[in-house]
């Protein structure tokens, strides 16, 4: 181990009409051993999507930022929390101003590997509704799996989208944690092209390129906060059960009641705001 080294995140852009509103594509370029799946195929996927967008003549509304992250696998010595360092530093140190400007981080991990019986987009709660609508309207894509693509949530701590999300950037990743590869080849010298699946790789190119186009057409960032509120409410119910067992429920009852009222108020306001924005946008579209 060589201490006190410097690594670099590598950033490129496809300028959009609105430079202060961005969609981020991210993947890490460091790896254990050769890292064919984890994560060189993901970096190549970003470049492939970017090239396709440029070659098509597409002029985005949002600036598309492509970021190859360093130090995802390992970036801190003498720590149990040594991964996703490059992404953490990118959003907390190098570009904290991205929070509020990046409307979505599309992170990529092991995208040329078949995971289970279907592709999944693992997303933060706020994007689940939009992604489900997006998947419902998709044209026929490469048939890489026997089952249709699905959305799952929440995101997990395994990958760089988590570092982005805890900073306030709504994030998602192609779900990559299923399958025997994770038990036999992951983070080892056996991560080579043996498990390369061209159909899965094509599907992920198509799926996320079209998602970029769908996000680019939104006048309002399509975040839905109801799932977050519902998860908080569920957590409070679980907390109540623990409190009853610990015989402290009475002490926390009033605080919980006030918190639940605020949560319900937040849910109502967020739903109303999103609905109003969509109605106004549709009215403008109809007028034009």
Report each predicted region and the residues it spans.
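Structural recognition of the beta-strand scaffold that forms the well-ordered cores
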Residues: 10-13, 22-26, 65-68, 103-107, ...
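Charged, amphipathic alpha-helical linkers/stalks
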Residues: 194-284
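Secondary-structure transition/capping motifs at alpha-helix termini
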Residues: 17-21, 52-62, 93-101, 137-142, ...
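Short, glycine-/Ser/Thr-/acidic-enriched flexible segments
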Residues: 15-19, 29-31, 71-73, 110-113, ...
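Soluble metallo-hydrolase cores and metallopeptidase-like ectodomains found primarily
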Residues: 1-37, 47-58
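Phosphate/adenylate-binding glycine loop and adjacent helical scaffold
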Residues: 286-288
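Active-site-adjacent substrate-binding region
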Residues: 1, 5, 102-103, 110-230, ...
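Acidic/histidine-rich catalytic neighborhood of metal-dependent amide-processing enzymes
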Residues: 31-126
């Amino acid at each position: 181990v060589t201490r006190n080294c410097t690594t670099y995140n590598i950033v490129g852009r496809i300028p959009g009409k609105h430079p202060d509103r961005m969609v981020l594509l991210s993947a890490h370029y460091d790896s254990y051993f050769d890292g064919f799946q984890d994560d060189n195929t993901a970096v190549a996927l970003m470049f492939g999507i970017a090239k396709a967008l440029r070659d098509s003549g597409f002029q985005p509304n949002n600036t598309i930022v492509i970021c190859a992250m360093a130090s995802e696998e390992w970036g801190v010595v003498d720590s149990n929390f040594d991964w996703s360092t490059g992404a953490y530093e990118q959003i907390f140190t190098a570009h904290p101003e991205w929070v509020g400007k990046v409307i979505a981080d599309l992170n990529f991990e092991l995208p040329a590997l078949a995971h289970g019986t279907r592709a999944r987009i693992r997303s933060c709660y706020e994007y689940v509704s939009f992604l489900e609508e997006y998947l419902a309207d998709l044209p026929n894509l490469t048939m890489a799996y026997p089952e249709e693509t699905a959305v799952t949530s929440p995101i997990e701590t395994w990958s760089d989208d988590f570092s982005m999300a805890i900073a306030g950037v709504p994030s998602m990743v192609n779900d990559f944690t299923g399958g025997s590869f994770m038990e036999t080849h992951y983070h080892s010298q056996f991560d080579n092209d043996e498990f390369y699946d061209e159909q899965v790789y094509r599907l992920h190119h198509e799926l996320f390129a079209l998602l970029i186009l769908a996000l680019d057409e939104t006048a309002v960032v399509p975040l839905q906060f109801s799932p977050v509120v519902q998860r908080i409410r569920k957590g409070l119910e679980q907390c109540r059960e623990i409190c009853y067992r610990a015989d402290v429920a009475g002490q926390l009852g009033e605080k919980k009641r006030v918190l639940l009222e605020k949560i319900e108020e937040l849910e109502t306001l967020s739903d109303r705001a999103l609905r109003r924005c969509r109605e106004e946008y549709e009215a403008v579209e109809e007028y034009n």
